[in-house]
Amino acid sequence: MLLTGGTSHTFPVLEIDGRAIGDSSEIIAALEERHPERPLYPDDPEQRRRALELEDFFDEELGPHIRLLAFHELSKDPERFEAVIARTTPGPVARLGSGAVTYARTYTGLRFGVRDEGAAELARTKIIAALDRLEAELGSNEYLAGDSFSVADLTAASLFFPLVLPDEGPVPTDEPPPAGIASFRAPLEERPGYRWVAETFRKHRR
């Protein structure tokens, strides 16, 4: 909100041509327009429709719930919560110093209800449902829409990051995940969708 003038409540935030964009779908659209030589939107109309539909599904049905669960488990370990915030908070918020942690704790509490165990249990159910959908949509294919990496793959893989924690992700994974995340993901690690997320990061994260 501080970066986008109240128009967005989420990270990441991209500043382009003096304009701060805080919605991931809008960020992708802006980058697609600016750098069309590496398209994330398929040319084929049906594949494009499918990619955008899946982008919307994972944004709406996975994103809020996996964020809630990640912060729910992190909130049980204040020191680790502070360490994660220090590593991931954007510059303008990080400049608040110790206030950044207070801001993050208040923000996640109000936006996600991170201390609500009922909400966390619903989040676990939603995450598994999203993994089911991912596997159903993939079938035996490498990509979700067509035969190349698209916005659908980018969205699904990036939103599953807090669960899978591949080494190629946006934050260091040198420490084990919170105990609650570790116990939740243990029975999921051999699922095709889980392995697909790890492989997608390995192949496409630079």
Where are these regions (language model features)?
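Short His-centered aromatic/hydrophobic patch
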Residues: 159-204
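Residue-level detector of alpha-helix boundaries and kinks
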Residues: 12, 36, 112, 118-119, ...
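Non-transmembrane alpha-helical segments in soluble domains
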Residues: 28, 32, 52-55, 59, ...
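Generic recognition of short, well-ordered alpha-helical interface segments
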Residues: 22, 46, 61, 122-125, ...
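Exposed alpha-helical structural elements
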Residues: 26, 50, 65, 80, ...
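GST-like fold's C-terminal all-alpha helical module
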Residues: 63-176
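GST-like domain detector, emphasizing the conserved glutathione-binding G-site
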Residues: 1-95
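Charge-dense, low-complexity intrinsically disordered segments
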Residues: 45, 117, 121, 187
